[in-house]
Amino acid sequence: MVLQKNWQSLIKPEKLEVEPGGEPLRTATVVAEPLERGFGMTLGNAIRRVLLSSLQGAAVTAIQIDGVLHEFSSVAGVREDVTDIVLNVKQLALRMHGEGPKRMVLTATGPGEVRAGQIQTGHDIEVMNPDLVICTLDEGVKFGMEFTVNLGKGYVPAAANRPEDAPIGLIPVDAIYSPVRRVSYKVEPTRVGQVTDYDRLLLTVETNGAVTPEDAVALAARILQDQLQLFINFDEPRPVRTEEPQDDLPFNRNLLRKVDELELSVRSANCLKNDNIVYIGDLVQKTEQEMLRTPNFGRKSLNEIKEVLTSMGLSLGMNVPAWPPENIEDLAKRLDEPF
């Protein structure tokens, strides 16, 4: 029980909101509250670093242009030289379904601008910024180009994208795989009930459209969860299982007991009474935030109640669909066994 207090005594964020930015699929602010004091900075910095470094994405790793042998060439009738075309290609935002590498093809005839939306991608790749200009062609010029696309994370320089058996004319490209463009966070104070020293975390995320900001944050949190699992070197005690009553109730029999039987401190008991909480079934449906809003109810009382409920295999914030039963008083009278 003492071991569990290390994490059970801490308040957990119960409210997660997503505030859309100018482009809802690309920019948004994810707000989480309440957090223990200091946890806003701890979680915000960790999630930000993972968002920028570790999310998988798709990027162009190499190109081939008809009639071009190397990146320091120029193409007749194309206003941009090959180096400028490569810089434009690096700005392509792609979403790829399945494993790579994949191939895309671009063919165009001048005059006019050649845009990313003209690329033939197939069913496995989506171009998220179709208005991106790849190059500009003069009258009557025919232009052909192939792209190699792959999945990865972070940044991979062009030299690492050149295969050993690269054909003549293959131009490797710096691959920026991360779908996240910018991340910032700030921590604001927030209050729960009478307590005012909690944190409110605001994560502002901008992506290239291949993943939404909300999903990006969820992926980063999952990565952190997976990496931290190794450090947990103990098994959590299992909740005490209680026998179900003969009435075949759809909930734990302890929910029918009155909170007076919990042997709480006078302060905690009075707070529950003033909030019209009679049965344990009424109590467990309350969240930590709701309890802390109760007048004169503080962290000490909250921890006391959580500890007692845990010993019974219960917790705050439970969903009890069939509560309260119509014959609750009759059922409660049958429970004369002591805890």
Swiss-Prot record:
Region (Alpha N-terminal domain (alpha-NTD)): 1-235
CDD domains, per the entry: RNAP_alpha_NTD
GO MF terms, alphabetically ordered: DNA binding; DNA-directed RNA polymerase activity; protein dimerization activity
InterPro entries assigned to the protein according to its UniProt record, in alphabetical order: DNA-dir_RNA_pol_insert, DNA-dir_RNA_pol_RpoA/D/Rpb3, DNA-dir_RpoA, RBP11-like, RNAP_asu_C, RNApol_insert_sf
Xref: Gene3D superfamilies: 5' to 3' exonuclease, C-terminal subdomain, DNA-directed RNA polymerase, insert domain, RNA polymerase, RBP11-like subunit
Enzyme kind, highest EC tier: transferase
Alpha C-terminal domain (alpha-CTD): annotated segments: 251-339
Pfam families referenced in this protein's UniProt entry, alphabetically: RNA_pol_A_bac (PF01000), RNA_pol_A_CTD (PF03118), RNA_pol_L (PF01193)
GO biological process: DNA-templated transcription
Superkingdom of source: Bacteria
Keyword Lipoprotein: no
GO cellular component, one term: cytoplasm
Subunit composition and interactions: Homodimer. The RNAP catalytic core consists of 2 alpha, 1 beta, 1 beta' and 1 omega subunit. When a sigma factor is associated with the core the holoenzyme is formed, which can initiate transcription.
Domain description: The N-terminal domain is essential for RNAP assembly and basal transcription, whereas the C-terminal domain is involved in interaction with transcriptional regulators and with upstream promoter elements.
Family assignment from sequence similarity: Belongs to the RNA polymerase alpha chain family.
Record function comment: DNA-dependent RNA polymerase catalyzes the transcription of DNA into RNA using the four ribonucleoside triphosphates as substrates.
Protein name: DNA-directed RNA polymerase subunit alpha
Gene: rpoA
